[in-house]
Amino acid sequence: MTLLALGINHKTAPVSLRERVTFSPDTLDQALDSLLAQPMVQGGVVLSTCNRTELYLSVEEQDNLQEALIRWLCDYHNLNEDDLRNSLYWHQDNDAVSHLMRVASGLDSLVLGEPQILGQVKKAFADSQKGHLNASALERMFQKSFSVAKRVRTETDIGASAVSVAFAACTLARQIFESLSTVTVLLVGAGETIELVARHLREHKVQKMIIANRTRERAQALTDEVGAEVISLSDIDARLQDADIIISSTASPLPIIGKGMVERALKSRRNQPMLLVDIAVPRDVEPEVGKLANAYLYSVDDLQSIISHNLAQRQAAAVEAETIVEQEASEFMAWLRAQGASETIREYRSQSEQIRDELTTKALSALQQGGDAQAILQDLAWKLTNRLIHAPTKSLQQAARDGDDERLNILRDSLGLE
């Protein structure tokens, strides 16, 4: 039995290829059934995200194993084998275990240390358990990877610092305001970055959010999710005074929030401070706003310095995390090898017990027929000894004939010979 991890990710393949190799939730069961129908596959898990598609497999070794699995993947997705082969990575046994542990811990992610991947790996594993796993070693590998990811989170700072613009903006707000639960936040825009910001703010107990967008329809789904109020961009001037924090990210070619608008808002707020985080390019907030007293303006470049600093911290933490992964993968493989030895020991014990039972039954039968007890016991002892040492004796003789001193010493050691 061999453990494999093979696939493509954001480092090896462009999005144009990654999108062709994805497995949709609707077809995942069918794909797993097809995968397990391959004669060499004992069990499988399919991990498919926007940044990676990977197969984790327990397989029987055979000739052309790699070719057979690549062919299955290409046939399933109607791909040219050369296109896939140039982007595919292939990990076996210890390397496969290490790879899964790194993936689950966020060490192989586009954003180093991002936590979402662990949930995606857990879902892939859960989906595979619906009648598709069929391999205890593979199941144990995933369970171990989950505990390793938790250990990495607990024992290192891999997830402690913001490394996305959205998260950095929220981190900045939390550094400036003692509690976000009492502030009002105005979000300008309704794109992906603002969506992430809104979710981060909701996680940090922000109670009052206003979302301003050019079209109310696009903002409505987000407001339903986070419980915000929707206004149009034209309403910003009137509502700016209500906001303690303004975070803006639109595609507007011209500034949306000008110096005069902020001056009026500050006057209405009796100069209560305002934090403005402009993460748009081109900028949504006129740079002159930063010169106003009690208006604290941060641009995307300011956030980038925070992100760069935090990324360096994560990279330092990643070194610690890699050490944990290396140690845990080594321990897992030792456990797996021990399972193989346990099976051999069970087979050897069963074989020995079968010989014992066979000869004992014959001896008891002879005694019941009135045979000489001493002679029967001596015969039992002689036959039992010969049957039990027959296979080791042949192995010792063969090692001696082959001149294989290393094997001979291993056999001597296993038989307890001085």
UniProtKB/Swiss-Prot annotation:
Underlying gene: hemA
Subunit and interaction comment: Homodimer.
HAMAP family linked: Glu_tRNA_reductase
Role, per record: Catalyzes the NADPH-dependent reduction of glutamyl-tRNA(Glu) to glutamate 1-semialdehyde (GSA).
Annotated site residues (Important for activity) in this chain: 99
Residues the record lists as binding substrate: 49-52, 109, 114-116, 120
Stated name of the protein: Glutamyl-tRNA reductase
Coiled coil: none
Domain-level remarks: Possesses an unusual extended V-shaped dimeric structure with each monomer consisting of three distinct domains arranged along a curved 'spinal' alpha-helix. The N-terminal catalytic domain specifically recognizes the glutamate moiety of the substrate. The second domain is the NADPH-binding domain, and the third C-terminal domain is responsible for dimerization.
Chain sites annotated for binding NADP(+): 189-194
EC top class named in words: oxidoreductase
Organism this protein belongs to: Salmonella dublin (strain CT_02021853)
